[in-house]
Each structure stands twice: as C-alpha cells, then as structure tokens.
Amino acid sequence: MAGNIFPVPESWAKSAFCDNETYLKMYEQSVKDPEGFWGEHAKRIDWFQPWTKVKSGSFEGDVRFKWFENGKLNVAYNCLDRNLAKRGDQVAIIWEGDDPKVSKYITYRELHDQVCRFANVLKAQGLKKGDRATIYLPMIPELAVAMLACARIGVVHSIVFAGFSPESLAGRILDCGGKVVITADEGLRGGKPIPLKENTEEALKKCPDVQKVIVVKHTGGKVPVVPGRDVDWTEAIKAASPDCPPEVMDAEDPLFILYTSGSTGKPKGVLHTTGGYLVYTALSHQYVFDYHDGDIYWCTADIGWVTGHSYIIYGPLANGATTVMFEGIPNYPDWSRFWNVVDKHKINIFYTAPTAIRALMRQGEAPVRATSRKSLKLLGTVGEPINPEAWLWYYNNVGEQRCPIVDTWWQTETGGILITPLPGATALKPGSATRPFFGVQPAIIDPEGKMLDGPGSGYLIIKESWPGMLRTVYGDHERFKQTYFSNYPGLYFTGDGARRDEDGYYWITGRVDDVINVSGHRLGTAEVESALVAHPAVAESAVVGFPHDIKGQGIYAYVTLKANWEHSDELRQELVKWVRKEIGPIATPDYIQWAPGLPKTRSGKIMRRILRKIAANEIDNLGDTTTLAEPAVVEDLIKNRQAVASSGKA
C-alpha cells in the first residue's frame, strides 16, 4: 500500500500558495542562501527594530546560534495589535467546550482587551521581563489569554498539560523557578471533572517560592482557597486597565519553556526564543496548511503540548487566522464529536493525531457518515508516523478523497514542522512525511555517522539550524549538547530513524530507541506495527523488543482487535504469517499478546517503556506512570502477560 501515489489535484496546484515548481525554487534558495531567504520572509511579521544579522553561530563547539540578531519585536503585538485595524471584529478564537452545547467566539479586539488586562494583572503580582510563570489550565480561552499576556510583558511561560500529576507539576515549577501559577478550579474532560486546584495545592507543598496563584473559576466546583495568596482571575481582570504597551523584546529573548520527556532522567525544559520562532511558525502555518483569509482552522491538540503552542496560538494568530480551541475528546458525547464540530463551525482545515484516527477507525465508518464534513478541504496529522492503512481510512472516509493530507514530522525541540507535504506542491504517499520544509536540511546517517546518499535507512539528523529551533535546555546547556549534538558532532540528532526512498521522500520509522535488533538485523517497531495494523482484524498494535537468548532481541507484539473480532490461537497464527508476508521472516513476532487497550499518555502517545518492561517480565519496576491516561490498562496487560508466556508463543 505504501506504493500508492496521490498526485496533486489540479485545482490545488492552481490555488495554493506553492506549486511544485515554486517549492523547488524556494527550497533551493532557502538552503543555498538562508540569510537571503529568511531575511525576506521575516518581513511577514512586524519589527520595532530591524536585525543586524540574519543567522550566526553553528552546531560546532559550544553549540550557540542566533537568528535575527539585535532585531526587536513583541509576539503578542504581532498576534493581536497589528491585526486590529484590518480584522479587529474578526473571530480570532472559536472555543468549543467539552459540553457540545457550549461554545464561544472571541474577536481579535476582545482577545486584545483581555490580554492587556491580564498582562497588567501579572505586573500587579510583581512579574517582570525574564520572570517565569507556570500555566496549569485546561483548554479554555483563558489559557490563550495567559500565554499571550506573558508574551506581551516578556514573562517566560511554562505551560504544564492539565492532565499531568501534582508531582509532574511540582517538578516543572521547581525546574523553571516559576513565581506565579495560573490554574483553574477544575478542568472538564468527557464530562468528568479534573481537580486542577487540588493538584496545584499538592504540588505547591514542594514549591515554597511560588508567591501567587491566579485561579480561573471554570466549573464553579468547590476547591480550597488560600487567602492572601490566591487571586481570583475574573475579579482581577475586571479591575485591571485595558492599556498595556508591549515590552520590546530581543529576537533571542526567551518566549517559553516547554518540558518534554527525555529517554533518561527528568523532563527537559526546551527553551524557545522570540523572533525566529514566530517567523518560522507563521510561515509554516501558512504554507503547510495553505491558510487563506477566511479559512476556519482546527488543530485538535492540547496547548499543553508544542503542537498547541505553535499551531493553535502563535502561528495562526500571527497570520490573522480564525483558530479553534477544543476542550473535549473525540468520543464525548459520542464518536461523531469531531465531525459534528467540523459541521457546526464549518471547519476547512483539520489537524489531528494518528492515535485519534486509529481510535476512530476502530469504530467503523458510521460515526463519520452520520455527518456532512463538506466544509473540509485539507486534513493533517501530527505526533507520530501514521501507518498507511490509517492514512487511507482518513483520506477515504473523513476527506472523501477530496482533501489532501499533510503528514507532518517535527518535535517539541524543532518549534515547528520540519518535514511535510505542501498541499499544492507534493504528490502524496500514504505513511510518508515526504519532503523538508524551507530551510530544513535533513540527512540520513548510519550508526557510524556516515552520511547516506540516495535511498537508504538510518538515523535522521539535521545539518544546519533553522529559525524555530530550541536554543538550549533551560538551566542545563550541557544536557542540550549531550542530548542533541554528542552522538554526531556538528549535526542535530533527532532521535528518530528514517528511510529515504528513490523519490527523496522521507519515511519516519519511529524513535531510535524503538528499534529492535534481531540476530544483527535492525527493525523499526513502526514497520512491524504497520504490518499488523494492515490486517483487517487489527485496530492498533505496539511492538517492542525483549531479551532473547539466541537472537539478542525478540519481537513482542501487543495487539488490540477491532470491535467485531474475537481473539483465538488461529488468529494469532494468521497474524504471524501476515507479518512474515508483509516484511519477511526476520520480522516474525515471537509473542503476540491480546491487549484490550494500550498504555497511553494523555496526549495519546503509547508508553513503550512500560510495554518493554512488561514484555521483559520486569513488572515490579515500571518507573513513573503518572502521565498514564488509564492506569487500569497496565494492570490488564500484566495479568495477561503470564498467560502469554505459556500459550502466546507465536
């Protein structure tokens, strides 16, 4: 199926910002003359003072680099003030609540007023340029207001996903030295309350330096209040002045810190700066999603993750877009929720995660067919590689074969999309992220660090910096160098494996730590998972390696079946043969364990570390499980593990 090619529809080639010829020209200029290219495209945002040098520094030595040196700007000014004259009364944010009966429309003028007032509230709490504020809010409009207010006065925000535990919150507050925490009484998810204020109180037992807690009354739930420390959001905003001049920021001043899990140790505080990040997110949002004035754009991510930072708030608002914020989940109140929202708000561009698509696919076509979706013109995926079967299901059923799919590859560290189709320029191959975005120079290297030419598989690295890239790990530049530049000095190591095909298209094969070495042969787990999911019985699978006496590592597959299939030994044998046929004998699974569900974080990522431990029977040392969406799933898997040892051998 990976051989399918979907050419660019003629209508897209004509109407899009970029056809193939334009892409090739722009890409060539962006890598041959990055200073000229980015100097030109940086004019898309407003600068208080122009830069003196577009790009300096390198990946060598101490790994320090700058973009738009000495340029002065303000992110909130670019997202709000400069849009007021032309589109003050245009809707900036459509907020769709967890309850399908609840939504709000917030214009640029209203958002600007709220942001200025809240920026003054932050100043009144003693916050100034360079200080850090921790934001622990659900997907409500106040989250957008809080981050833009921080940006307006030069306060560095650290947003903590509202699904994280008190321990995770405390660790992030302590690491960044946050003085103020902005939270809510409760969040809502699928009709169930999330005790955010209670979690905050628990976390603050370990954070003596937090001086103020600003609380949004979202559900009205009864929560603890600490007089003298807690500030009521609504009262404070009402009393604040709507006049707040934007702080003049240097292009290299920090904008935000966002924590991402490392393969070892505590989460890393990825630090993004102001000028390069905004230029990169705005340009990539316009070109990747072919965003035209009047389009309604919906990225389903949570703002607690980088996708929400870059492609719900900063990129879209810098482009004067109408962006949708969604508090809910795909299956509440039922499995048609996404598509009902699409119809309700006449969404044109829809960007979601493969894990959501696979969950929807498992429910069949009926919940999709129950809706119109005729407003959709473009679909996107983000967060992990999408297997060709899920891609085709999405293309055929959701987009009804009329909507191109932009399968985007990037990371918290990269700030924005690095490898992606452009809808008017790129012929699509299901499962491939296709080609690099402007200014991005990917390459594939083998484990010894030799650069591969032409088709080949290996580690994905990036040769040169780009404007949206992280500058350091907050408070730990050594860890930054160690993590990203020590394996192959002078090159940014992504930690992902990739394959480049004969057309120069990139296929992301999964994390390098998700590689299994079977009898000296390297296998990407994503490849085996794709083969399993291609079987009509399989809804989802996760594959890990486990210690094997003879082969070094064996293949252990967790398989979730579609609703109308029953597990049996016959089906297990059939799946083994299927994988052998799809990939070859080297990929034969040693064990297949039936899994009613897979352990996932609240952002939908499968926690493979836990699956590896269970496969290796190291169940008394599962490590940190606080980010699990459904802890009961793990208990089920452990219970089933013993049965697999005796009967699950494939």
Swiss-Prot record:
Identify the PROSITE patterns for this entry.
Answer: AMP_BINDING
One annotated GO molecular function is: metal ion binding
Recorded GO cellular component terms are:
cytosol
Q: Which Pfam families match?
A: ACAS_N, AMP-binding, AMP-binding_C
Job of this protein: Catalyzes the conversion of acetate into acetyl-CoA (AcCoA), an essential intermediate at the junction of anabolic and catabolic pathways. AcsA undergoes a two-step reaction. In the first half reaction, AcsA combines acetate with ATP to form acetyl-adenylate (AcAMP) intermediate. In the second half reaction, it can then transfer the acetyl group from AcAMP to the sulfhydryl group of CoA, forming the product AcCoA.
NCBIfam families annotated for this entry? Ac_CoA_lig_AcsA, PRK00174.1
Protein name in UniProt? Acetyl-coenzyme A synthetase
PTM-bearing positions, type N6-acetyllysine: K605
Q: Sorted alphabetically, which Gene3D superfamilies does this protein's record hold?
A: 3.30.300.30, N-terminal domain of ligase-like
Q: Which domain of life is it from?
A: Bacteria
Cofactor(s) in the UniProt record: Mg(2+)
Task: Describe PTMs of this protein.
Answer: Acetylated. Deacetylation by the SIR2-homolog deacetylase activates the enzyme.
Catalysed reaction per UniProt?
A: acetate + ATP + CoA = acetyl-CoA + AMP + diphosphate
DNA-binding as a keyword? Answer: no
InterPro entries (alphabetical): Ac_CoA_lig, ACAS_N, AMP-bd_C, AMP-bd_C_sf, AMP-binding_CS, AMP-dep_synth/lig_dom, ANL_N_sf
For this protein, the Enzyme Commission number is 6.2.1.1
CDD domains per record:
ACS (cd05966)
Q: Which GO terms describe its biological process?
A: acetyl-CoA biosynthetic process from acetate
Keywords for this entry?
Acetylation, ATP-binding, Ligase, Magnesium, Metal-binding, Nucleotide-binding
Q: Does the record's keyword annotation contain Metal-binding?
A: yes
Q: Where does ATP bind?
A: G383, E384, P385, D407, T408, W409, W410, Q411, T412, D496, R511, R522
Binding positions (CoA): R189, G190, G191, K192, T307, N331, S519, R580
**What residues does Mg(2+) bind to?**
V533, H535, V538
The similarity comment for this entry is:
Belongs to the ATP-dependent AMP-binding enzyme family.
